[in-house]
């Protein structure tokens, strides 16, 4: 395929991560950060349309990213059918994510960039995967650390065995499961070379559960243990407000601190430096999707790894509800996230 071809992108959800999170960061290494900014920066994509049920938010996003008014839609389904985009970004909340992803996959999208968490229920997650696989649609989840050059350098360093065999992984600030846990679980999978999960055990707090409807009314926070097929254990804690991670190997430790701003290798009698150029994880994710369309295969991401990290979220919830270890693969309980909250107004300016 001609490497100069440009893919046409359309955005579903024009709020914070969709279009305006760039205004919250002063770190140039993070830019572009939002979906819209990423497509605008990438020379292989054109952002041609957007959709949001809030017309005021959509108009400002359209003005910001030079999207013609006729290509701004309240109804995302109409947008996909009329615009026929190559790439669809779904930057909604998880409660609305599955319907939009499945519709895009079934109606001509070549690739989908979906925000995390992947879905509001485990069944929805599998339905999304089925639609993407059936239609040969490339899929990347917005777990940005997977596409971060620093964390990729860390993962490759561990994989090379410089410090011997990986034994233990620790995340110190797992956060709430759908918002931050989705990032953390995906990163733990990445650092452990995508090894299969064999079980999880979790204890959750801030757990608002409607037993009649079997719905979570808030994003739960908690901690737990993830066991892998290669005998590595990962501990997902909430014991620090600082976002940091340790990879404990036979002969040393690799640490990511300051949310991946710095990486430290501690090894007896040896000095190592993780050498990498800091680049935008959003832009890397989009380039990865473009390569997936070009060559009909997944690279850094894909639907399979997205499903694996989502299963950990629901495994944690199921472990808490049943007060037991959940062994993978498992039959999911009928659990769904269904919050009642008002959308926040994004920050339109720096």
Predicted regions span which residues?
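C-terminal helix-rich "cap/oligomerization" subdomain common to oxidoreductases
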Residues: 1-6, 11, 45, 51, ...
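N-terminal Rossmann-like dinucleotide-binding module
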Residues: 1-65
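Hydrophobic residues in well-ordered beta-strands that form the structural core
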Residues: 11, 113-114, 139-141, 236, ...
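Stable alpha-helical structural segments in soluble proteins, enriched in small hydrophobic residues
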Residues: 28, 58, 281, 285, ...
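A contiguous active-site-proximal alpha/beta segment in oxidoreductase catalytic domains
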Residues: 87, 113, 118-182
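NAD(P)-dinucleotide binding in Rossmann-like oxidoreductases
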Residues: 213-219, 227-287, 299-303, 316, ...
């Amino acid at each position: 395929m001609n490497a100069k071809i440009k893919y046409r992108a359309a955005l579903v959800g024009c709020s914070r991560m969709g279009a305006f999170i760039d205004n919250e960061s002063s770190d140039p290494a993070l830019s572009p950060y939002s979906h819209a900014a990423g497509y605008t920066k990438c020379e292989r994509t054109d952002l041609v349309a957007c959709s949001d049920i809030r017309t005021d938010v959509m108009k400002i996003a359209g003005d910001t990213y030079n999207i013609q008014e006729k290509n701004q839609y309240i109804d995302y389904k109409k947008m996909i059918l009329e615009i026929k985009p190559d790439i669809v970004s779904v930057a909604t909340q998880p409660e609305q994510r599955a319907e939009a992803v499945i519709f895009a996959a079934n109606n001509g999208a070549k690739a989908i960039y979906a925000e995390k968490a992947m879905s509001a229920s485990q069944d929805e997650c599998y339905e999304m995967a089925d639609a993407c696989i059936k239609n040969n649609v490339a899929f990347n989840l917005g777990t940005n650390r997977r596409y971060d050059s620093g964390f990729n350098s860390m993962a490759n360093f561990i994989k090379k065995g410089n410090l011997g065999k990986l034994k233990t992984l620790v995340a110190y600030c797992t956060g709430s499961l759908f918002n931050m846990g989705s990032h953390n679980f995906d990163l733990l999978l990445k650092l452990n070379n995508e090894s299969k999960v064999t079980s999880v055990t979790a204890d959750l707090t801030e757990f608002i559960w409607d037993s009649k409807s079997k719905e979570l009314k808030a994003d739960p926070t908690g901690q737990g243990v993830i066991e892998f097929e290669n005998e590595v254990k990962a501990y997902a804690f909430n014991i620090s407000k600082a976002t940091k991670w340790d990879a404990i190997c036979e002969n040393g430790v690799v640490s990511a601190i300051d949310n991946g701003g710095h990486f430290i290798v501690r090894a007896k009698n040896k000095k190592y430096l993780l050498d990498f150029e800091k680049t935008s994880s959003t832009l890397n994710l989009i380039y990865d999707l473009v390569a997936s369309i070009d060559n009909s295969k997944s690279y850094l991401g894909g639907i399979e790894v997205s499903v694996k990290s989502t299963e950990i979220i629901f495994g944690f919830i199921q472990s808490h509800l049943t007060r037991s270890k959940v062994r993978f693969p498992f039959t999911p309980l009928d659990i769904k996230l269904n919050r009642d909250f008002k959308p926040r107004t994004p920050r339109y300016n720096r």
